[in-house]
Amino acid sequence: MVHIISKKTVSFIGQKLAAQIDEQLFTKYGFKVEQLMELAGLAAAQAIAAHYPKSNVAVLCGPGNNGGDGFVCARHLQQFGFTPSIVYPKESRNELMKSLVVQCETSSIPITATLPTNLQAFPLIVDALFGFSFHPPTREPFTEMLKTVRASGIHVFSIDVPSGWDVELGAPSGNDDDVIHPHSVISLTLPKLCMKNWTGPHFLGGRFVPKSLVDEHELLMPQYPGFEQIVKLED
């Protein structure tokens, strides 16, 4: 059972502050990208395991850090008894991403560049295409993929920011058939401003922010119970 807290007790942050917090974690505080990626992906997998029954899961991974979170999430989902398949439409040359690919390949997790032809065999899709640095609109090879996912009606779990959303303003108005409208979301570190009015299942993970960094930015951080890595936000 995931501990529930009021979303009024945590800060919602914009794109600039989110980037600043990451930069400070990687420099002043000595964290490595792969450390935080592992924690983020594990938190996402824990939220999924708490909210959904074991099933086939299609994990859509972009070439950046959000995609890395997706690879880690897929690996942990397999450990939790799910059957993940990764969709990786745009490969990264980054050595960390290459390592994550190897980790999943050697765990016999399928990796393809396109959506499965039997997409309806996957009751859940994990959206890990774009992170908080994304600026609309979407571009290929992602646009058509997002349209297919949107039209499928399959439940989508988004990691941090739903694909196609402006990080601060949320889903664009008008023609948005290439924009994910998720059924559930996990925010990482702190929820972004685009999630302020979100009313669906909303998890939060990222139990690693040093107190001095919290104090510097006067942030409201969640009170995680015991040794839990995620909480659930409600009104």
Curated annotation (Swiss-Prot):
<keyword id="KW-0479">Metal-binding</keyword>
<keyword id="KW-0521">NADP</keyword>
<dbReference type="InterPro" id="IPR032976">
    <property type="entry name" value="YJEFN_prot_NAXE-like"/>
</dbReference>
<comment type="function">
    <text>Catalyzes the epimerization of the S- and R-forms of NAD(P)HX, a damaged form of NAD(P)H that is a result of enzymatic or heat-dependent hydration. This is a prerequisite for the S-specific NAD(P)H-hydrate dehydratase to allow the repair of both epimers of NAD(P)HX.</text>
</comment>
<dbReference type="InterPro" id="IPR004443">
    <property type="entry name" value="YjeF_N_dom"/>
</dbReference>
<keyword id="KW-0520">NAD</keyword>
<feature type="binding site">
    <location>
        <position position="127"/>
    </location>
    <ligand>
        <name>K(+)</name>
    </ligand>
</feature>
<dbReference type="Pfam" id="PF03853">
    <property type="entry name" value="YjeF_N"/>
</dbReference>
<protein>
    <recommendedName>
        <fullName>NAD(P)H-hydrate epimerase</fullName>
        <ecNumber>5.1.99.6</ecNumber>
    </recommendedName>
</protein>
<feature type="binding site">
    <location>
        <position position="163"/>
    </location>
    <ligand>
        <name>K(+)</name>
    </ligand>
</feature>
<feature type="domain" description="YjeF N-terminal">
    <location>
        <begin position="18"/>
        <end position="221"/>
    </location>
</feature>
<dbReference type="GO" id="GO:0005739">
    <property type="term" value="C:mitochondrion"/>
</dbReference>
<feature type="binding site">
    <location>
        <position position="160"/>
    </location>
    <ligand>
        <name>(6S)-NADPHX</name>
    </ligand>
</feature>
<feature type="binding site">
    <location>
        <begin position="131"/>
        <end position="137"/>
    </location>
    <ligand>
        <name>(6S)-NADPHX</name>
    </ligand>
</feature>
<keyword id="KW-0413">Isomerase</keyword>
<keyword id="KW-0630">Potassium</keyword>
<dbReference type="InterPro" id="IPR036652">
    <property type="entry name" value="YjeF_N_dom_sf"/>
</dbReference>
<feature type="binding site">
    <location>
        <position position="66"/>
    </location>
    <ligand>
        <name>K(+)</name>
    </ligand>
</feature>
<comment type="similarity">
    <text>Belongs to the NnrE/AIBP family.</text>
</comment>
<keyword id="KW-0547">Nucleotide-binding</keyword>
<dbReference type="GO" id="GO:0052856">
    <property type="term" value="F:NAD(P)HX epimerase activity"/>
</dbReference>
<dbReference type="GO" id="GO:0000166">
    <property type="term" value="F:nucleotide binding"/>
</dbReference>
<feature type="binding site">
    <location>
        <begin position="65"/>
        <end position="69"/>
    </location>
    <ligand>
        <name>(6S)-NADPHX</name>
    </ligand>
</feature>
<dbReference type="GO" id="GO:0046872">
    <property type="term" value="F:metal ion binding"/>
</dbReference>
